[in-house]
Amino acid sequence: GHGFYYASGSITDGWKWYDNPETINKLTPLFEKYGVDMVFSGHDHQLELLQKSGVSYVICGTFGGALDSEREYVSPQSVWYSSKDYAFVDVTINGAEANLIFRDPDGKVLNSFVIPKN
């Protein structure tokens, strides 16, 4: 989806750009119930990997507009975060695991993770 679920972030113009209770309360129980392994979103202009109850949440919103400022709030679900680079996420699924590689526009690796299937 476009909008985020769990996320680190800041308050901008009165809006909380982090851990969205509306999407968390409505959709994350379904992700957990039906065994969803990974959820991708953007909207926030940052890179982040978050994990909660066996579901990995990947935010990759850094290939367009201005990058977000450094986060003021750190989500308890956050595993890794960056708002310093324009980037994309390269995903390879190999049977029981997914390899996530966050890359800058030139392909340089910023970070990588192996996510096992639930």
Describe each region flagged by the PLM.
Residues 1-110, 118:
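Long, structured stretches of catalytic cores involved in phosphate-ester chemistry, encompassing
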